[in-house]
């Protein structure tokens, strides 16, 4: 994900990163972001000293479908907390804010690194529901997730990484769901 977002160069063994057909492998991260790639990093990384609303507004693009109202519609709890500093939010609220902040950039591609990490079951269910809503709305999401149930529930396509970052398996989630032996071999379940 960090390579796709322009935060790390592609491996020396070759390869490239393309966004809408354009090779962005050598571009700095801010130029990759301008081309519509947004990252929700592992660990959330919100601006703790800024309010919820300031966190959202600081990255907002003036044009596009995502604005404060739409983010607040997706995550109503953020409306209640809009004047609170980011550091005062629970882990789940911080994750909602991190996702909302990325959406405010109106991304073509939303990268999400371990969005379920450290979340309570009720919050995890909410995030799962919202990822499903984003999927239905046509938002492209690339998810790196160790929670297999979550990944299989929201994905259109699954890639399981093997040795040295190679793709060990790729296909529709139903194929893995219907083949527990294959799933166990690939991910050790």
Across the structure, where does each feature detected by a protein language model lie?
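Glycine-rich phosphate-binding loops of nucleotide-dependent enzymes
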Residues: 1-189
């Amino acid at each position: 994900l960090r390579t796709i977002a322009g935060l790390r160069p592609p491996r020396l063994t070759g390869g490239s990163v393309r966004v809408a057909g354009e090779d962005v492998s050598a571009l700095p991260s801010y130029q990759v972001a301008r081309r519509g790639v947004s990252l929700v990093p592992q660990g959330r990384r919100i601006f703790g000293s800024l309010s919820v609303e300031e966190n959202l507004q600081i990255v907002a693009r003036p044009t596009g479908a995502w604005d404060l109202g739409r983010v607040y519609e997706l995550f109503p709890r953020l409306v209640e907390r809009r004047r609170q500093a980011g550091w005062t939010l629970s882990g789940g609220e911080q994750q909602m804010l991190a996702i909302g902040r990325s959406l405010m950039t109106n991304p073509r591609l939303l990268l999400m690194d371990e969005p379920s990490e450290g979340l309570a079951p009720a919050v995890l269910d909410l995030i799962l529901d919202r990822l499903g809503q984003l999927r239905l709305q046509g938002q492209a999401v690339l998810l790196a997730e160790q929670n297999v149930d979550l990944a299989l529930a929201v994905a259109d396509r699954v890639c399981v990484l093997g040795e040295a970052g190679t793709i060990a398996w790729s296909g529709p989630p139903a194929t893995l769901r219907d083949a527990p032996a294959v799933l166990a071999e690939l991910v050790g379940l």
